């Protein structure tokens, strides 16, 4: 009887996902832990490994189709496979039993280990492990996020759990895995630089990566849904420049890398409060406008895999230093591919910084269902008129795109003027921000 593999709960709050790519087809022979597919949810792409070895009988879900946790997505001829169930499908009773087991003496023996983990474990760490391994970790009182994986691509196995219980952390295995990843990456890079085909107009093709598909879908949806208007302006930021310079060393003393971006975040939040139409969502189908009484700012981040938008939540409650620290932490996570889906949810307005790439004015695309996005360009020395004289000053380029269904031109410009006023005199951020 064929083993029916169901889409598992991968432990990141994902209840459904789009099958963006299959790595197997009917007739393929696979080994346990081989990657079966890539699943997309929001902007996170997760590899789904096989829990068994065998032969693929049938792929039941096509690429581009959304599957729900518990749906059978592939059948595998695996005669020696044990009966397996996955979190999210038919294991409610097991979950209840596990909760009771966690109060047993076995758990008490591991309590001292767990107490140490709590102060050291990175709870935002992305874990690669099969549901059976996660269950095994729970049964043995192990926080799986404290375990280093020795499997393919850093995947955690039962042996890693055993090694952890015996006082090890599988670091050697993890290093081996990292080396393996590096080697495989070199192979991919080598293949990518293979000789071009012959002819006067050589062309090569590649499949669109899952991340690029997600970005393309979001951009097209935004442009097709919201009539965009973009206002472009600039502002003398000499006082902002001096203010950052004054507090840069103080920030560094407490481990904070102070940039101009946190000032822009605070100025934008102030504008959203003063002009709340920019902090809404426009639901034309339902005939509703959703007013958001919280201020979460998305920060568009350029990564090797594509555009990601981590979110600074409750930015109105945080200081310049706190926002700076959070932006830097999220940027590192974005570059390392360690952002969780939760860290990319809930933005009410977004900032796109093309200035970091040397750009100036542009037409940023709204991060739908938001209704506005603020683009910031580079700060450049320009001649300006001050007190009747032409002087050189650092000037910041700003671009504000908004959904014209919800925001009128005058409202958009008034919001832009408010942002300019605060950035021109950063002390006002303390008074009004």
Swiss-Prot record:
Q: Which domain of life is it from?
A: Bacteria
Give me the comment on cofactor binding. Answer: Binds 1 lipoyl cofactor covalently.
Residues the record marks as active site: 404
Annotated EC: 2.3.1.12
| Compositionally biased tracts (Low complexity) | 166-185
The record places domain Peripheral subunit-binding (PSBD) at 128-165
Note down the stretches annotated as region Disordered: 80-134, 164-204
Keywords (alphabetical) are: Acyltransferase, Lipoyl, Transferase
Please give the Pfam families that the UniProt record associates with this protein: 2-oxoacid_dh, Biotin_lipoyl, E3_binding
Q: Which GO terms describe its cellular component?
A: cytoplasm
Does the record carry Transferase as a key word?
yes
Carrying N6-lipoyllysine, the residues are 43
Cofactor(s), names only, from the UniProt record: (R)-lipoate
- Location of the Lipoyl-binding domain: 2-77
Provide the reaction this enzyme catalyses.
N(6)-[(R)-dihydrolipoyl]-L-lysyl-[protein] + acetyl-CoA = N(6)-[(R)-S(8)-acetyldihydrolipoyl]-L-lysyl-[protein] + CoA
Offer an example of a GO molecular function term for this protein: dihydrolipoyllysine-residue acetyltransferase activity
Listed InterPro entries: 2-oxoA_DH_lipoyl-BS, 2-oxoacid_DH_actylTfrase, 2-oxoacid_DH_E2_comp, Biotin_lipoyl, CAT-like_dom_sf, E3-bd_dom_sf, PSBD, Single_hybrid_motif
Comp. bias (Basic and acidic residues): 84-103, 117-126
State the function annotated in the UniProt record: The pyruvate dehydrogenase complex catalyzes the overall conversion of pyruvate to acetyl-CoA and CO(2). It contains multiple copies of three enzymatic components: pyruvate dehydrogenase (E1), dihydrolipoamide acetyltransferase (E2) and lipoamide dehydrogenase (E3).
Q: How does it assemble?
A: Forms a 24-polypeptide structural core with octahedral symmetry.
Similarity remark: Belongs to the 2-oxoacid dehydrogenase family.
Query: Which named protein is this?
Result: Dihydrolipoyllysine-residue acetyltransferase component of pyruvate dehydrogenase complex
Gene that this polypeptide is encoded by: pdhC
């Amino acid at each position: 009887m064929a083993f029916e593999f169901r889409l598992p709960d991968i432990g990141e709050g994902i209840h459904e996902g789009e099958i963006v790519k299959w790595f197997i087809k009917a007739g393929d022979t696979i080994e346990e832990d081989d990657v079966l597919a890539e699943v997309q949810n929001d902007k996170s792409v997760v590899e789904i490994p096989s829990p068994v070895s065998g032969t693929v009988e049938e792929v039941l879900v096509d690429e581009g189709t959304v599957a729900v946790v518990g749906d059978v997505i592939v059948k595998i001829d695996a005669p020696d496979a044990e009966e397996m169930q996955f979190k999210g499908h038919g294991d409610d009773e097991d979950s209840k039993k596990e909760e009771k087991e966690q109060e047993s003496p076995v758990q008490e023996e591991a309590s001292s280990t767990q107490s140490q983990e709590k102060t050291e474990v990175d709870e935002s760490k992305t874990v690669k492990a099969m549901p059976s391994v996660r269950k095994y970790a729970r049964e043995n009182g192990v926080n799986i996020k404290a375990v280093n994986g020795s499997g393919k691509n850093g995947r955690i196995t039962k042996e890693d759990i055993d090694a952890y219980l015996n006082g090890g952390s599988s670091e050697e295995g993890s290093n081996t895995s990292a080396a393996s990843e590096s080697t495989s990456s070199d192979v991919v890079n080598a293949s990518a630089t293979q000789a071009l085909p012959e002819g006067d107009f050589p062309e090569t093709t590649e499949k669109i990566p899952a991340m690029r598909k997600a970005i393309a879908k979001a951009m097209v949806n935004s442009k097709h849904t919201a009539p965009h208007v973009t206002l472009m302006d600039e502002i003398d930021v000499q006082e902002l420049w001096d203010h950052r310079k004054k507090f840069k060393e103080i920030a560094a003393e407490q481990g904070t890398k102070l940039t101009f971006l946190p000032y822009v975040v605070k100025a934008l939040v102030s504008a959203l409060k003063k002009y709340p139409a920019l902090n809404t969502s426009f639901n034309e189908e339902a005939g509703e406008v959703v007013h958001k009484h919280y201020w979460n700012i998305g920060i568009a981040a350029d990564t090797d895999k594509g555009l990601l938008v981590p979110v600074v939540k409750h930015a109105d409650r945080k200081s310049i230093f706190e926002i700076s620290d959070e932006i830097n932490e999220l940027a590192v996570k974005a570059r390392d591919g360690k952002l969780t889906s939760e860290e990319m949810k809930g933005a009410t307005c977004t900032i796109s910084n093309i200035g970091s790439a040397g750009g100036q004015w542009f037409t940023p695309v709204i991060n739908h269902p938001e209704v506005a996005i603020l683009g910031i360009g580079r700060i450049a020395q320009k001649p300006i008129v001050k007190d009747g004289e032409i002087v050189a000053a650092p000037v910041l380029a700003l671009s504000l795109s908004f959904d014209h269904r919800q925001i009128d031109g005058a409202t958009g410009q008034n919001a832009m003027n408010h942002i300019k006023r605060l950035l021109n005199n950063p002390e006002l951020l303390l008074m009004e921000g």
